[in-house]
């Protein structure tokens, strides 16, 4: 694990199934005396507990014209689980501006790399590549940083308000501001396999891109995911919901041919 942006960076499991994620997360969880940002928060997960009584929210625009058949199938499967599924909304905020806070932290972390010109050794040297984003961050003022911290707090309040209404949020990974916002607030996200689409090879994407358009070429059966976001320190409930949704979708057992 390499530190990029200390106030955002977090360690999480990457597994073939939801229950495996719960097992790995139970090992990762806990406070580390060498890490002053770690918290001694409990982690509770019971694979047999069930998910009755949960309230699941979704942003309508996330399932609009750009949503895929896999996205819609995942929402339909969530409805079949028997819990209440409701439309929700988030306040209008300049969520995208938070990227500048991330770039400033990353530039500070890799200051020595920039000042020594060792970033010239990095293979990717495009306009949107790290060497140039590090340098651009140096033009942010102290006033900019204070205002960005204020915005971050507003986003924290917005997501806390959302999860006061629902137990979890479902949607594609690029659901509204959620990928960016939840990174800055710490709200947990479970991204899981939901189905497959026939797609061509996609081009490389920058750190700020969530989706990239497929290029022309030979198409393959590519796995697609759906995301679940939940309350702070409530990963157990999120994983229980993911486990039930995984069973309803019935695609987790399909593995790539080697």
Predicted regions and their residues:
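A short helix-breaking turn/cap at a secondary-structure junction
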Residues: 1-72, 247-258
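Short, well-ordered beta-strand elements within core beta-sheets of diverse protein domains
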Residues: 9-16, 135-140, 228-230
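Short, well-ordered beta-strand elements
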Residues: 13, 222-234, 238-242, 246
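Acyltransferase
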Residues: 46, 65-89, 110-121, 145-167
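Short helix-loop capping/hinge segments that flank enzyme active sites or metal/cofactor-binding pockets
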Residues: 50-59, 100-156, 201-226
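Short connector loops at secondary-structure junctions
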Residues: 83-100, 134
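Short hydrophobic alpha-helices that are characteristic scaffold elements of the AMP-binding
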Residues: 183-184
